[in-house]
């Protein structure tokens, strides 16, 4: 079976990860002790993708949990599904990274990384045919960003041909936790561009907006945000965990979504949006799902797809529905909004149908888009980075851990290159190339 190894790092990564496992366990009928109590064969058919079956018939998540301080992990362990994880797979230090990327990547994190890699190796050896890794982390702090990217590059070295998927929470302008977020995020993106295959971009600001506007929650807590993230993650991974009419795996996802290797940062959306307590009481139709899913307000990252163009997109529909209707709806969206899709990639929207809906819903859909408008987000972080870096503010925290200013300059220009690559493809039209070729012809003649 094609297994996926899940790794979560830092405070944010561990909280999102814990939530993700709660959702996945519920969908597969697995209780908090790891025993199966579900009612459908389909729940077990591809359970090996995320779980290892222990000798006593219990299912243990293929998960590695790491952090540089014990706090968050203790709360995961004492949480609702804390007892389901393998105890040896909790790897933590005592010092903390203090929101410092350099501590996570070079000093504190580097001391802990070997014990994390040992656990990763052990889990990978337990797999029949490992298809890839998924990493949950945030880019604003120290551990998830610094140590997370260190781990990704080490795994890259050791398993060069396996797919690396990340769920990365970007810092957002309104919800700031630390003043050095732009530094940490830029240094991380520099790593992710090189070492990750696919990055699902999540963003606290967009999540707040959804909670506030759509779900009418006046004071959204991190629990509410994580509920949304876990719904999205469950949707992105559902066709890997359940049989369906149009299946896909991490590699197929990448092949359909990434036209150029560096442009692998995806916007994700989810429909129908529900708050934690209230699942919707009316059944949705495929057209309604489609309409909601493409809506800019449903995107969980703070970039507006209407400001750019889609290079590629992919939709995962869940529930009992006709594939024909799904295809018609997707074609309909493309025809009506053709200006928002680049015309030089025909048929650039793919859809997948998975038969099992999320808990409490009859139908749902998840959207994954590779849109040039995501440059807004990089641009925003880059501006904040430059403002501080120009004055060398807070830099001593990083140089004190042995970093060089040169690294900052490199990361900054890499981020700006990424933005201009997105811009270049946004402006490109199908006819550009033809003219250039004709000119060459004439020149030769």
Curated annotation (Swiss-Prot):
Role, per record: Tubulin is the major constituent of microtubules, a cylinder consisting of laterally associated linear protofilaments composed of alpha- and beta-tubulin heterodimers. Microtubules grow by the addition of GTP-tubulin dimers to the microtubule end, where a stabilizing cap forms. Below the cap, tubulin dimers are in GDP-bound state, owing to GTPase activity of alpha-tubulin.
Keyword presence, Cell membrane: no
GO CC terms, sorted: cytoplasm; microtubule
PROSITE patterns in the record: TUBULIN, TUBULIN_B_AUTOREG
Composition bias type Acidic residues, residue spans: 429-445
Cellular compartment(s): Cytoplasm, Cytoskeleton
Pfam families tied to this protein: Tubulin, Tubulin_C
Name by which UniProt lists this protein: Tubulin beta-9 chain
